[in-house]
């Protein structure tokens, strides 16, 4: 199954003897919430879906109990289903040995909330002078979409936000991120780190600037399926998600370099998905090469980039200055595109390690990771 399904029914493989005080009718009236069901293996997902199709809008748990469930999406590359069901029914479903976990489909938000010298600071023009502009490199921007803009060349994309089928940006965040990666060298507006990189608008956050784990996981799956070289995730959540970690791992195994924002709370630990081992975690610095006060730091931080007063593209063919680790992350994604153009045979792991090895040290690895991304050194 490769696309969202309508309301259907699931039944577990085992009959679980669980007593409930509520009736089926009252359970049907309970408000449902979104969950992600992780299975031990892909085959178990198929068996579960077959059980779904064999019943009539209920999951049969025992002779006494039936549970309504709505299947929203079946992932292709990770053994996970996105569903809606009553919170009261989660414990019963978790007793199925084929299910490894059930987690809430948590909200994930952008990493910039306030209103770009950064291109020069990371020495991108020096790489441009060598003929390295990101040409031929595909960069997926998993964000609020990207608005049509005279300073951007958007090659395609997809939306995974319910009710927002267009990849146009109703928020501004994604358009700003896209400009830092690849604003065109066309004598107007601003210049991106990799002005000839191919931008793909992968909408996973709505106009409000928030979205769900399932939308982001679908966006990562799309990136892997469509040959993206780099995925920029200027977003995050304080809570871990097994589904999101699997999606990051799957995309990485398919050649995508996942670059993610460390977070904006200023805390001494980084957000998810940046904290996952296969994501490249990016913190923010100011004009003095100091850690930005809001930039989260700590174990797992890979690298830093400019994230204060960053000028970039904005909806309505305009420009805006924003702050955040969201603004730092695309500097690194753009630098990755430059390195990929210079070394087309390199894997995502090689590119990540090279960016870290060529970064300019700023001091404590706890605060700055390997240091400030350096596009000039990375493309020598």
From Swiss-Prot:
Cellular component GO terms, alphabetical: extracellular region
Residues that, per the record, bind Ca(2+) 1: 113, 151, 184, 186, 188, 190
- Annotated active site residues, numbered on this chain, are 143, 173, 326
Its EC number is 3.4.21.-
Keyword Phosphoprotein tagged: no
* Example GO biological process: proteolysis
Q: Where is the signal peptide?
A: 1-27
Is Methyltransferase one of the keywords UniProt gives this record?
no
Cofactor field? Ca(2+)
Identify the enzyme class: hydrolase
Propeptide per record: which residue ranges?
Answer: 28-112
Recite the UniProt cofactor note for this protein.
Answer: Binds 2 calcium ions per subunit.
What keyword terms does UniProt attach to this protein?
A: Calcium, Hydrolase, Metal-binding, Protease, Secreted, Serine protease, Signal, Zymogen
**Cellular compartment(s):** Secreted
Q: Which residues bind Ca(2+) 2?
A: 274, 276, 279
- TM region(s), chain numbering: none
Q: Which Pfam families match?
A: Inhibitor_I9, Peptidase_S8
Which molecular-function annotations from GO does this UniProt entry contain? metal ion binding; serine-type endopeptidase activity
Coiled-coil regions listed: none
Q: Which residues form the Peptidase S8 domain?
A: 116-379
InterPro entries to which the protein is assigned, alphabetical: Peptidase_S8/S53_dom, Peptidase_S8/S53_dom_sf, Peptidase_S8_Asp-AS, Peptidase_S8_His-AS, Peptidase_S8_Ser-AS, Peptidase_S8_subtilisin-like, Peptidase_S8_subtilisin-rel, S8pro/Inhibitor_I9
* Entry's family note: Belongs to the peptidase S8 family.
Question: Under what name is this protein listed?
Answer: Alkaline protease
Q: From what organism does this protein derive?
A: Alkalihalobacillus alcalophilus (Bacillus alcalophilus)
């Amino acid at each position: 199954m490769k696309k969202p399904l309508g309301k259907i029914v699931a039944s577990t493989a085992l009959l679980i003897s669980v007593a409930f005080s509520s009736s089926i009718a009252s359970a049907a009236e309970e408000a449902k919430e979104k969950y992600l069901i992780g299975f031990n293996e892909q085959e178990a997902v198929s068996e579960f879906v077959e059980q779904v199709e064999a019943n009539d809008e209920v999951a049969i748990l025992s002779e006494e109990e039936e549970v309504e469930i709505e299947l929203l999406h079946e992932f292709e590359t990770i053994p996970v289903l996105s569903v809606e069901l009553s919170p009261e029914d989660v414990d019963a479903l978790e007793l199925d040995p084929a299910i490894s976990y059930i987690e809430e489909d948590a909200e994930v938000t952008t990493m910039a909330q306030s209103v770009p010298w950064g291109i020069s600071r990371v020495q991108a023009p020096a790489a441009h002078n060598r003929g390295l502009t990101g040409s031929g490199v595909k960069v997926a921007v998993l964000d609020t979409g990207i608005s049509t803009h005279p300073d951007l060349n958007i090659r395609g994309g997809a939306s995974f936000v319910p009710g927002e089928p267009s990849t146009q940006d109703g928020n501004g965040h994604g358009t700003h991120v896209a400009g830092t990666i690849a604003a065109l060298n066309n004598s107007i507006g601003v210049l991106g780190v990799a002005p000839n990189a191919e931008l793909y608008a992968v909408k996973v956050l709505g106009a409000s600037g928030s979205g769900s784990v399932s939308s982001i996981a679908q966006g990562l799956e799309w990136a892997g399926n469509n040959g993206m070289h780099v995925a920029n995730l200027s977003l995050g959540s304080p809570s871990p998600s097994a589904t999101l970690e699997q999606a990051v791992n799957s995309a990485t195994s398919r050649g995508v370099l996942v670059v993610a924002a460390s977070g904006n709370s200023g805390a001494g630990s980084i957000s998810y998905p940046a904290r996952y081992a296969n994501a490249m975690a990016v913190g923010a610095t100011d004009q003095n090469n100091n850690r930005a006060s809001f930039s989260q730091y700590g174990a797992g931080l890979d690298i830093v980039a400019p994230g204060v007063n960053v000028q970039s593209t904005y909806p309505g063919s305009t420009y805006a200055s924003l702050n955040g680790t969201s603004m730092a992350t695309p500097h690194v994604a753009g630098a990755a595109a430059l390195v990929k153009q210079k070394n087309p045979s390199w894997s995502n792991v090689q590119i990540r390690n090279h960016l870290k090895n060529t970064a300019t040290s700023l001091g404590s690895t706890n605060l700055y990771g390997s240091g400030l991304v350096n596009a000039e050194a990375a493309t020598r």
